[in-house]
């Protein structure tokens, strides 16, 4: 089990670091009193591997409880319980700027100057910083920079492509564009199988409709261009730290063209070693047209 204690200066990025750890599959607990860490660690270690990555956020907001941290760490060490400490730091100038931008007061100086609170906090955290296994200075970091750094230290070293969940979603414009779409493509310019009597009753999941749609010159050109676009976009989304991408492909009713093309894009993404899923939101809607609604 990997057991990470996250601490550091207020405003240095502990919240963002914790979100990154959650994205990496860590079970995160915020501001657990240090005296409870021993019991929590024992429970985690007895969990039959159900919890194998844990992160505890400990900061100065714990007040007097924070003073118990060193006693707890010594206890864990004596009992050969492996843990690591991550310390988030930043320059005084950057911390002051962040507090001013957020219009928050410093927890150690709620009615006074932010700088006074920072000075006090540095003094109180000096010993825990000296014990830290990893110190990350976020002074020059944007959120994505910190995310990349967290992945570097705490990721599972799986291919970055596998860390972006891609959903290819077919839909019908008559039923509305999916509200959670990241990318939306309109394929209503492609010849419609709906007007072919022998194909009308089938969907884009059926071979006859799929073959008809994919052999169209417009489809061939569109799919190639879309694949080129995704080969450019996906690595950049991963670099940015995006965790989920929803690609919505729509036709009129969401039954023929969008389904066939969504399936084709889904297959190409998986061949390209990406983690993709396929959903057809409206493929059965036209079957229920004319039915009375409750």
UniProtKB/Swiss-Prot annotation:
Entry keyword set:
ATP-binding, GTP-binding, Nucleotide-binding
Q: Which InterPro entries match?
A: P-loop_NTPase, RapZ-like, RapZ-like_N, RapZ_C
Family per similarity comment: Belongs to the RapZ-like family.
HAMAP family per the UniProt record, alphabetical: RapZ_like
Question: Do you know which NCBIfam families this protein is assigned to?
Answer: PRK05416.1
What is the role of the protein in this entry? Displays ATPase and GTPase activities.
**Protein's name according to its UniProt entry:** Nucleotide-binding protein CLL_A3342
């Amino acid at each position: 089990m990997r057991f990470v204690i996250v601490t550091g200066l207020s405003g240095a990025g502990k919240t963002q670091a914790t979100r990154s750890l959650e994205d990496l599959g860590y079970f995160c607990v915020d501001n657990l009193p240090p005296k409870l860490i021993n019991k929590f660690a024992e429970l985690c270690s007895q969990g039959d591997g159900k919890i194998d990555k844990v992160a505890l956020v400990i900061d100065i907001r714990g007040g007097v409880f924070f003073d118990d941290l060193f006693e707890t760490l010594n206890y864990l060490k004596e009992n050969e319980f492996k843990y690591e400490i991550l310390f988030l730091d930043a320059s005084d100038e950057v911390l002051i700027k962040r507090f001013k931008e957020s219009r928050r007061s410093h927890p150690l100086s709620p009615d006074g100057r932010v700088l006074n609170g920072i000075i006090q906090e540095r003094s109180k955290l000096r010993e825990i910083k000296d014990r830290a296994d990893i110190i990350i200075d976020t002074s020059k970091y944007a959120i994505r920079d910190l995310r990349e750094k967290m992945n570097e230290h705490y990721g599972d070293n799986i291919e970055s492509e596998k860390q972006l969940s891609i959903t290819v979603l077919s839909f019908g414009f008559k039923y509305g564009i999916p509200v959670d779409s990241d990318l939306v493509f309109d394929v209503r310019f492609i010849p419609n199988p709906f007007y072919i009597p022998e194909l009308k009753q089938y969907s884009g999941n059926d071979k006859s409709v799929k073959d008809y749609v994919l052999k169209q010159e417009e489809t061939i050109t569109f799919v190639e261009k879309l694949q080129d676009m995704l080969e450019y976009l996906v690595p950049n989304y991963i670099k940015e730290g995006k965790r989920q991408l929803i690609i919505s492909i729509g036709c009129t009713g969401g039954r023929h063209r969008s389904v066939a093309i969504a399936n084709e894009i889904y297959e190409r993404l998986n061949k390209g070693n990406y983690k993709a899923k396929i959903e057809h939101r409206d493929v059965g809607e036209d079957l229920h047209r004319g039915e009375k609604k409750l």
